[in-house]
Design a protein with these regions (language model features):
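Class I S-adenosyl-L-methionine-dependent methyltransferase catalytic core
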Residues: 1-187
Length: 187
């Protein structure tokens, strides 16, 4: 994917952020016709790993910054590579979203590569020496699935509780939540 205007405009940002929350539009291989209808590229434009790695994130990263980046388990290795290419050190899984169906309280089961998948993880990486404000933030997020790839709103609240009311931006955002700057082609 060539750098479109939306991605190049990160070069023009002058504000530095202490919290970056990202849900990249990962491209990944489907192995069956059944999986193709549910893949991300049927719902929005996706990016390959190299293009995600090469985003000019360094223009917006503060000296002491925490990155939260969503990744699926099949792309865990690539997710850590992206985190590191953006200048962060992997620390832990910040959040593990255990998914329930839209209507019932039963578990949601994706197709998966080997086993039927359910949860999605949000990696946590740091740059500099950011501080944890609260020790009471839990990793497990038990919430319903919504429209394709939309993450639970509670995660943003937990991030602020964990890190404090610091300058923050959501990358690849689909909406503009209060208190957050946003960037992406769906806002």
């Amino acid at each position: 994917m060539a750098e479109s205007k939306i991605y190049m405009d990160l070069h023009n940002y002058t504000k530095k952020y202490n919290i970056i929350y990202a849900d990249p539009p990962w491209s990944f291989k489907t192995y069956s016709d059944k999986g193709k209808g549910r893949s991300a590229d049927n719902h929005y434009p996706v990016m390959n790993i190299e293009d995600i790695k090469n985003l000019p994130i360094q223009h917006i990263v503060g000296d002491d910054c925490v990155l939260f980046i969503w990744v699926t388990f099949p792309l865990l290795k690539e997710g850590i590579e992206v985190l590191e290419s953006w200048g962060f050190t992997y620390k832990t899984i910040g959040f593990n979203w255990v998914k329930r169906n839209k209507i019932s309280d039963s578990w949601f089961w994706g197709l998966g590569y080997w086993t039927r998948s359910n949860s999605e993880i949000c990696l946590l990486g740091t740059k500099g020496n950011p501080k944890r404000i609260s020790a009471g933030v839990h990793q497990i997020v038990d919430d319903r699935i919504m429209k394709h790839s939309k993450k639970p709103d509670t995660v943003r609240q937990r991030i602020v509780e964990l890190c404090g009311d610091l300058p923050r931006i959501e990358l690849f955002a689909r909406e503009k939540p209060d208190g957050w700057d946003v960037w992406g082609n769906e806002v």
